[in-house]
Design a protein with these regions (language model features):
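N-terminal [4Fe-4S]-dependent radical SAM core
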Residues: 1-17, 27, 222-294
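Flexible, glycine-rich loop/tail regions that form catalytic "lids" or insertion modules at the edges
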Residues: 12, 20-24, 65-66, 191-194, ...
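Conserved SAM/AdoMet-binding glycine-rich loop
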Residues: 22-24, 38, 52-53, 57-58, ...
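N-terminal pre-triad scaffold of radical SAM enzymes
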Residues: 23-29, 282-309, 342
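Glycine-rich beta-alpha loop elements in corrinoid/cobalamin-binding modules
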Residues: 35, 54-244, 252, 256, ...
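Terminal amphipathic helices with adjacent charged low-complexity linkers/tails
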Residues: 59, 187-233, 246, 255-258, ...
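Flexible glycine/acidic-rich beta-alpha junction loops that bind and position SAM and/or redox cofactors
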Residues: 82-91, 140-142, 172-177, 201-202, ...
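Conserved, mostly hydrophobic/aromatic
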Residues: 164, 266, 301, 326, ...
Length: 599
């Protein structure tokens, strides 16, 4: 059964009041991949009366007044993606398509959706229950932050939205604690993962440079952000406070990561794995095609990539599910209509982080003076892919499962650092769990750019390439590597993109196609460098391409077609046949006669 999204569903349940109303910028997909569904089901499971209003019309009160007011609180999220990232390209152009909207047309989610929905509530309900912000848009904008789309330092989204509370991170436990305290009229000020506004700073909390100071001086903004960045681990983080106008933002320490039992509980909830019928007339939701038959094995990431916001939202400690929980979910997928035997993805932010974590981090918290993976894999991490191998073997043996694909990205450096099970794991994945292509994200080839990204050098990538070719040939399969690249990252110049293009063609035998222009999203170190124009570690000036034309040009340099490469942009990896080389160039499409030069 879906979480109610219509008045008719509320009546059938016999409810006359709701405890919580959740607002989202996406169409409502009931799935463990969708935050509003997880939060809604978490509340339902302990007895709260919950409903969802997906993509309400902000020009009228028709949608927002559908259920009246909640007894406890309104929950507001922009959706699975920051609304400005979902609505705008890196060049600022409006996106026409939307994978999270029924019908696929990007016409339902407003820019700055969290602020728009909070204002919509206040417009139609003057004195109402608390407005609580959550989801990735609120999470990444919880303190003063650089906003790429307006090119200025903005206040916390809590301040701009005039909301009562903000829950950052994944919040499955925080939401229950908040609801219980509000029901009992209790004090919520001690709740982990909570931000709120106060008249005075909180004693014992670290005072950050104010919003006014951060706006006036890039050096103050850098000091503020680095202090925020150092206080993200739940075991070591201090509470933070920051003056914004006449009020203070109080930022409590992060919530603790979920235990394995809690992860199993969350993913064991009774999700329908479908789009709510209220969207039926609008058409399908493309995102469902991927997530319906996929499985989350873990969350969080300690990769430390400077451009990535996963750690700021999910945390840098990996929380993983038990093998039994994952196998149960896989067995359930076989009973769903439309399932044809293939699990489309088994993984998380990084597929091969399942099954191990740094014991020192789990006991004492993450290190503040080093990264787990950069510039090399830390000796304290001790990666072991044994549990991942065992899990994949279990999934292969399930009745009704033809293939369980590992479609999430793989970290070559992490895999190669596991001298016992790393290479056997790669062999198993290539033989059984690749659906034509394996995804990796080297992002660049030039050392000075990789250093700005917090990514390792190309040595592990080239070793991985050789192993991929070897195991592909052994398996007798035709499959290839898909590499993801970033253009216009801080520190990257046109010459670096030209060098990357040569590297991709000569060393990887592929024509780059999966290329994105760097988008400065809030709460990342790369965005800090984009704004200040300095390397935050050395203080030295960096080249930062900020013009739209220059950013587009960097991408064009990389994707320019190379002679000898045809449709698909790759030199295919195929097994030996009839004495011919297994490395063959896919031929270009034949030129139509009408395009040939006249004699």
């Amino acid at each position: 059964m879906f979480i109610p999204a219509t008045a008719d569903e509320i009546r059938k349940l016999g409810w006359t009041k709701l405890d919580v109303i959740l607002i989202t910028g996406d169409s409502y997909i009931d799935s463990p991949f969708v935050g509003v569904s997880v939060i809604g089901r978490r509340l339902l499971a302990v007895g709260y009366r919950v409903a969802i209003i997906p993509q309400p019309d902000i020009a009228s009160g028709r949608d927002i007044t559908r259920f009246g007011e909640p007894e406890l609180f309104w929950g507001v999220t922009g959706g699975c993606i920051d609304s400005l990232v979902a609505n705008r390209t890196a060049s600022g152009k409006r996106r026409r398509k939307d994978d999270f909207t029924a019908g696929g047309i990007n016409n339902r989610r407003p820019d700055r959706a969290v602020i728009a929905y909070a204002n919509l509530i206040r417009r139609h309900f003057k004195e109402t229950a608390p407005v609580v912000l959550g989801g990735i848009e609120a999470s990444l904008r919880r303190i003063a932050h650089y906003d790429f789309w307006s090119n200025r330092i903005r206040r916390s989204i809590l301040t701009d939205a005039k909301a009562d509370f903000l829950l950052y991170g994944m919040a499955e436990n925080s939401i229950l604690h908040l609801a219980a305290n509000l029901r009992e009229n209790g004090d919520v000020s001690e709740l982990r993962g909570l931000c709120y506004a106060a008249a005075t700073p909180r004693p014992g909390f670290l005072e950050l440079p104010s919003w006014e100071e951060s706006t006036a001086d890039p050096a103050a903004f850098e000091k503020m952000f680095l202090a925020f960045h150092r206080n993200q681990d739940s075991r070591t983080a201090r509470g933070l406070c920051q003056k914004q106008d006449s009020r203070w933002l109080i930022h409590n320490p992060p919530a603790h990561p979920l235990t394995q039992a809690e992860m199993d509980e969350v993913h064991g909830m009774d999700f329908v794995r479908a789009v709510h019928p209220c969207h039926q007339s609008a058409g399908g939701v493309r995102a469902l095609e991927t997530i319906r038959f996929s499985i989350v094995t873990h969350r969080g990431c300690y990769g430390g990539c400077h451009f990535c916001a996963i750690a700021a939202h999910e945390g840098q400690t990996v929380s993983m599910r038990s093998e039994a929980s994952i196998v149960r979910e896989a067995a359930c997928l076989t009973s769903l209509s439309g399932f044809k035997g293939r699990i489309l993805d088994v993984g998380g932010p990084t597929a091969n982080m399942y099954g191990f974590e740094c014991k020192k981090k789990l006991q004492r918290g993450a290190c503040t003076n080093r990264s787990c993976l950069y510039p090399a894999v830390c000796k304290n991490l001790r990666p072991d892919h044994g549990l991942l191998i065992a899990l994949l073997r279990k999934l292969r043996k399930l009745p009704g499962i033809k293939q369980a694909v590992v479609a999430s990205g793989i970290r070559p450096d992490l895999l190669l650092a596991d001298r016992k099970n790393g290479i056997p794991c790669l062999r198993e994945i290539i033989r059984h769990h690749v659906s034509g292509q394996m995804k990796i994200a080297p992002e660049h080839s030039e050392q000075k750019v990789l250093r700005c990204m917090g990514k390792p050098g190309t040595q592990s990538l080239l070793s991985f390439r050789d192993l991929f070719r070897k195991f592909t040939e052994e398996a007798g399969k035709e499959q290839f590597l898909t590499c993801y690249w970033i253009a216009a990252h801080p520190g990257c110049e046109q010459a670096d993109m030209e060098a990357l293009r040569r590297f991709a063609v000569r060393e990887l035998a592929l024509q780059p196609e999966q290329v994105q222009i760097f988008t400065p999203t809030p709460s990342t170190l790369s965005t800090l460098m984009y704004y200040t124009g300095r390397d935050f570690r050395t203080g030295k000036r960096l080249f930062v391409e900020k013009t739209a034309a220059g950013r587009e040009l960097q991408k064009k340099i990389l994707v320019a077609k190379t002679p000898g490469f045809g449709y698909g942009g790759r030199i295919r990896q195929t097994p030996k046949r009839e004495g011919k080389s297994w490395e063959k160039t896919r031929m270009s499409k034949r030129i139509p006669r009408k395009n040939l030069p006249k004699r």
